[in-house]
Amino acid sequence: MNALTAVQNNAVDSGQDYSGFTLIPSAQSPRLLELTFTEQTTKQFLEQVAEWPVQALEYKSFLRFRVGKILDDLCANQLQPLLLKTLLNRAEGALLINAVGVDDVAQADEMVKLATAVAHLIGRSNFDAMSGQYYARFVVKNVDNSDSYLRQPHRVMELHNDGTYVEEITDYVLMMKIDEQNMQGGNSLLLHLDDWEHLEHYFRHPLARRPMRFAAPPSKNVSKDVFHPVFDVDQQGRPVMRYIDQFVQPKDFEEGVWLSELSDAIETSKGILSVPVPVGKFLLINNLFWLHGRDRFTAHPDLRRELMRQRGYFAYATHHYQTHQ
């Protein structure tokens, strides 16, 4: 399959009944699947992991895999292979995940446990320097004075990949909605590389493989610059990206103009999906061929949104960047 192959209908294994969860295509795209844990599965999972507070998962990293096994066992061991199959499938690579009954900020710790279990069935979440943990929770409010667009509510946060300014491989990104008050707008934005109509033009450009400098602002707690190209290929030679407009530092006029044109071509793509993510749900995407961002919010003095993210590497395949590790 080449980079521009049309979506193959995987039929979401439409005839298959899963134990402990359901799986359907999303309303936005057949590439994005919706996975919902049943009320019984959710209840049993939370009961079985109740002995471990979130702090235990922070201090003892092996417990993150333990809670993952508990969740997979409750799903008759069908969950882990389904997650891996979906995320490693170039035609899909994205899930919107929900657990029935987990939908209130009072259940924030339960949300962290659930997301941790899912993430550690596919790999391991990296250390997040911004929070000092394997996950980060942060709040978006009506007024923001931070040093990046992460928390700024009244503008679009442009499409990007995570992990651009760190040396660790970032195969997946998980983004969970923990709380939302007085919110209008702010949908998640997603773009699959193969749905980007300008991919071939920019992937074939001479600057596509030139190593460029990426530097993070102070809030990220990362002081070392990293160098890598915007584009690379996976094991099958298909395009993957490692790009964010805020942190790439062009060294000259040629790079600056090309990056500016690249940004415009991404932001105006007709392939962008707008995905609402209610409280308690989370997106889990393949970071190599999905870009993500956020639409703007409608201003409100008491606007509040709390998010949780995890990002890490796949432990069951080597679909990494091939030429610049």
From Swiss-Prot:
Alphabetic keyword roster: Dioxygenase, Iron, Metal-binding, Oxidoreductase
UniProt-annotated binding residues for Fe cation: 160, 162, 292
Pathway: Amino-acid degradation
Superkingdom of source: Bacteria
Xref: Pfam families: CsiD (PF08943)
Reaction(s) this enzyme catalyzes, per UniProt: glutarate + 2-oxoglutarate + O2 = (S)-2-hydroxyglutarate + succinate + CO2
Note on how the cofactor is bound: Binds 1 Fe(2+) ion per subunit.
InterPro entries: GlaH, TauD-like_sf
Annotated function: Acts as an alpha-ketoglutarate-dependent dioxygenase catalyzing hydroxylation of glutarate (GA) to L-2-hydroxyglutarate (L2HG). Functions in a L-lysine degradation pathway that proceeds via cadaverine, glutarate and L-2-hydroxyglutarate.
HAMAP family, per the entry: glutarate_hydroxylase
Protein name per its UniProtKB record: Glutarate 2-hydroxylase
Organism: Escherichia fergusonii (strain ATCC 35469 / DSM 13698 / CCUG 18766 / IAM 14443 / JCM 21226 / LMG 7866 / NBRC 102419 / NCTC 12128 / CDC 0568-73)
